[in-house]
Amino acid sequence: MRAAFLVVLAALSTSPASAANLELQAKISLAGGRGRIDHMAFDPVSRRLFVAELGNDSVAVIDVDDHRLERRIADLREPQGIAYYAPLQRLYVTGGGDGTVRAYDARDYRELKRIKLGSDADNIRVDLRAQRLYVGYGDGGVAILQPDSLDLVGDIRLNAHPESFQLSASDGRIYINIPESHSIAIVDTAADNRVSSFDAKWGGNFPMAIDEVSQTLLAVFRKPPRIARYSSKDGHLLRDVETCADADDVFLDAKRRRLYVVCGQGAIDILESVTLKRIERLATSPGARTGLYSSEADLLFIAVPARTGGEAAVWVWSPAP
C-alpha cells in the first residue's frame, strides 16, 4: 500500500499542464532543427518569435499567431544570445562559435552589420533608455555597443565569463552572474562602470531575473539546484529554496507575482516571487532548459530540442488566471 501511494505521489509532483497556472496552447514544430537551442527574443508588433538554434547554426523565425515556422536565418556560428531593438527594427544575434554580434533588418532579415568581439559572444541585453547594447563575451568582458552602427563604445572587465545579466531601470546598475567564481558582479553605470561583487554562496549561477518593485535580485543555481533572492541594494541573501535541476532561464511574471524557472531536467517550476514557495512543477521535455516569458504577449515560450523519435519545437504556454 505504501509503495503504491509513493508512485501516485511521484506522478502528481510533476504535472503535464494546469489550467490554474499555465495552459499548454501549442507545440510549434522546428522541423529540421538539430542540437541545442539557446535564447529567444520577441517582437510584439509583428508577433514574431526569434529562436537561437545553436546546434543548427541558425535562427528560427516563428509566426506566433499562426503557430508556424516562417523561415530561418542560416550560416551562423553557434548563435547564443538574441535581442530585438524596436526603434530600429533590428535583430541582434551573438555567435558563440565566432565571437561576433550580427545586426539584421527585422523586416527582411538582411544582415546589416557585424562586429567581432573575441571568443564566445553570449548573452545580450538592450538598454532602451541609454540606447546601448550590452554583450557578454570571452573570459570576462561585457562589450557596450551602439545599436545603429555596432561601434564599440565601452568594455567592462570582469574576473571570468559572464552568464545571464540584467539591467536595472531604477538605479542604472547591471547585475551579472559569474558562475566560475560563484559570484554576482554589480556594475554602476552612473560611476564610470565601477565593478563590485558579492559571494553568491553556490555554484552554477546561470539564470537571473530582477524585481524592480521589491528591489530584489533572483539567481538560480545548478550546483546544487537552488534559487536565491537577494537585496539588489547590498547583495544580502533574503531567502533560498530548492528548485528543478539544470536551469538556464528564469522569468518574473510581474502581473501575477510569479517566477517561472525553466530546467533541463524537463520541468518548469512556478514559484511565488517573494516567498519562493513552489506553486507547481510542470513537466516539459528533457533538455528543454531555455525559454522566454513575454509580458506583452503574456505567453511563456519553451524551447524543446530534438530527441530520438521527435522533432524540435517551441511549446507555447498561457499563464492563468
Q: Over which residues does each language-model region extend?
A:
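Predominantly soluble domains enriched in secretory-pathway, periplasmic, or organellar proteins
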Residues: 15-321
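Bacterial N-terminal signal peptides
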Residues: 3-14
